[in-house]
Design a protein with these regions (language model features):
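An N-terminal domain-start capping segment
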Residues: 1-5, 138-140, 222-227
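Glycine-rich phosphate-binding loops that contact phosphosugars or nucleotide phosphates
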Residues: 49-202, 281-321, 325-330
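Short, charged, surface-exposed secondary-structure boundary motifs
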Residues: 94-96, 167-172, 265-266, 335-343
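Catalytic-loop motifs flanking and including active-site residues across diverse enzymes
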Residues: 67, 71, 174-179, 238, ...
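Alpha-helical transmembrane segments of integral membrane proteins
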Residues: 56-59, 231-234, 337, 341
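Active-site phosphate/pyrophosphate-binding segments
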Residues: 18-46, 51-53, 151-279, 357-384
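Phosphate-moiety recognition in structured ligand-binding domains
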Residues: 1-17, 24-25, 29-30, 151-155, ...
Length: 384
């Protein structure tokens, strides 16, 4: 695998494809930069992480919010720190429920543009509510409000990731995965760094290479009307992001849903019919994987869906009993690493499904009612 991860040319001529393809290279660039910033990061973070009762909230809007859903569970268990994921869209509407003035707070704000109204307002509300509040924005846009406000603040460390991750396409692709990798490297450098993460970059590069010019589609083409992504733990966050990619790039022409395998039985399974594609992200953890495989086998026995596809790192009798994708060979991946692999398939599927349905992936909202940077938000001042 070439060390610079040179991406293949975009066969579709879209920014979205180009941005999907350059992800492995962007990750290593960003993590190499974080290696260089390690001393400065430690100077900022180490005193904070020693604070008793420190809360660490991962926040963002839309796709940027799902970063926290994917990585916060692992960061909390791995570091023993109080990580949680709360969208800016919840922080802004209900600050009194999430911002506790009695505990110090580190707010990690993710943003592609750094200009979403809720993201800017969440920082201001956190400062207003919590006397001892600190900020670590991770953003793709040097000119964005998140970054510019942070570099002029004495309670913040601004982390800028490579400019090419400021996706020009409508949907966030390289931006979400590079912000994910960067945050993991900041808080778990012994596990996620520019050297160890090459295994993830290599595997994802192999996935993209295996898909050729993307024209055959990831899951083939069929007249499905619905898609459901399922994943356990942090992989439910990856499932949520995968579903949003389909909704965004097809402009809602293909209905998309997400859940956990165990949660899916509790009502949502009702949506499965003979026009439904179900994709199960199979966990790499041997305990969790049992639950994923139980549901996979059940869905196939039900014989209600048009197709049920498993994506897994290794095969088994249950996986191999129906349509499946086995990840390219590599070392054992924990689920937070495996999420990057699953997103390669999901992003590519959404792109090609968009084109297949006659959409323009870079500007999928023909009506203009859904925007790349959200519009129409009125921020109401908090008055205690």
């Amino acid at each position: 695998m070439p060390k610079n991860y040179t991406p293949a040319a975009a066969a579709t001529g879209t920014w979205t494809e180009e941005e999907i393809r350059h992800q492995p290279r962007a990750w290593i660039r960003s993590l190499t930069n974080i290696d260089a910033l390690r001393s400065a990061l430690n100077n900022f973070l180490e005193p904070l992480l020693r604070k008793e009762n420190l809360r660490i909230i991962l926040t963002g809007a839309g796709t940027s919010a799902f970063i926290g859903d994917i990585i916060a569970p692992w960061l909390a268990s791995h570091t023993g720190k109080n990580f949680s994921a709360v969208p800016t869209t919840d922080l802004v509407t209900n600050p009194m429920d999430y911002l506790n003035p009695a505990h110090p707070l580190l707010l990690i704000s993710f943003g592609r543009s750094g200009n979403s109204p809720e993201s800017v307002a969440a920082v201001e509300l956190a400062n207003q509510f919590v006397p001892e509040c600190y900020h670590l924005p991770i953003t793709c846009n040097e000119a964005g409000a998140l970054y510019q406000n942070a570099i002029n603040s004495d309670n913040a460390f601004a982390l800028l990731i490579p400019a090419e991750t400021h996706d020009r396409g409508f949907a966030m692709t390289s931006s979400i995965t590079t912000m994910m990798a960067s945050c993991l490297a900041v808080f778990a450098p012994e596990t996620i760094n520019s050297q160890t993460f090459r295994d993830v970059a290599d595997r994802c590069q192999a996935i993209l290479t295996s898909l050729g010019d993307f024209s055959e589609g990831v899951f083939g083409y069929a007249p499905w009307k619905r898609i459901v992504y399922l994943g356990s733990g942090g992989l439910q966050g990856a499932a949520r992001e995968s579903a949003l990619k389909v909704l965004e790039l097809t402009a809602g022409k293909l209905a998309a849903f997400y859940d956990s395998p165990t949660g899916f039985r509790h009502g949502p399974k009702s949506l499965v019919d003979d026009e439904t594609l179900v994709v199960v992200f199979v966990s790499s953890h041997p305990y969790t994987r049992q639950y994923d495989l139980d549901l996979l086998a059940e869905l196939r026995r039900d014989n209600q869906a048009m197709r049920v596809i498993a994506i897994a790192a290794e095969s088994s009798d249950i996986v191999a009993a129906g349509p499946h994708i086995i990840l390219p060979p590599s070392r054992h991946f924990i689920d937070v690493e495996q999420a990057f692999c699953f997103l390669m398939y999901a992003q590519t599927f959404a792109l090609m499904q968009s084109l297949h349905m006659g959409n323009t992936p870079d500007t999928p909202s023909a009506s203009g009612t859904v925007n790349r940077v959200v519009q129409g938000v009125i921020i109401h001042p908090w008055q205690a």
